[in-house]
Amino acid sequence: MKRKKHLVKITAATVICLTVFLAVLFGNAHISAESYSVSLQNLGGPVRIVLLSDLHGKSFGRENSRLIAKIQEQTPDAIFLDGDMIDRSADPTDVQELLRLIKRLHEIAPVYFAPGNHELEYMQTDTSLLTQVAEAGAVVVN
């Protein structure tokens, strides 16, 4: 009886661990778009904004092709990158990937970049990040 209880506990723990692992694995690869309507006086008409944040260097397809396609589908008037696009421990390759993403997004709509805590920590070792972001086509909001 004791052995059967032990086997049930091990099986339950294994199922829970596997479920959590799969949720994290597939959740990190999924792109979703949420729509919100906000009414602002004196705006002069509807404006579509895409807000991206907390990618932490994650890539969605080769050169972010899936992410870029999803953003193009939204036909935005502006794109806001709201921090933590890279990790605090990013290497030059991660930064170049971010800059390529900004260049591609800039072809779709104006891009606005606000650094998050990870960018701010990264800039303690590479102070040129915001200059590079601006040169890639984003307006830096700091």
What is each of the regions a protein language model found here?
Residues 8-11, 20-24, 51-53, 84-85, ...:
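N-terminal start-of-chain detector that recognizes signal peptides
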Residues 10-12, 42-44, 75-78, 105:
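Short amphipathic alpha-helical segments, especially helix-boundary/capping motifs
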Residues 12-16, 49, 111:
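A generic structural signal for ordered alpha-helices
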Residues 26-76, 91, 127, 138:
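N-terminal signal-anchor transmembrane helix
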Residues 1-43:
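N-terminal membrane-anchoring alpha-helices
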Residues 63-142:
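Core catalytic region of metal-dependent phosphoesterases/phosphodiesterases
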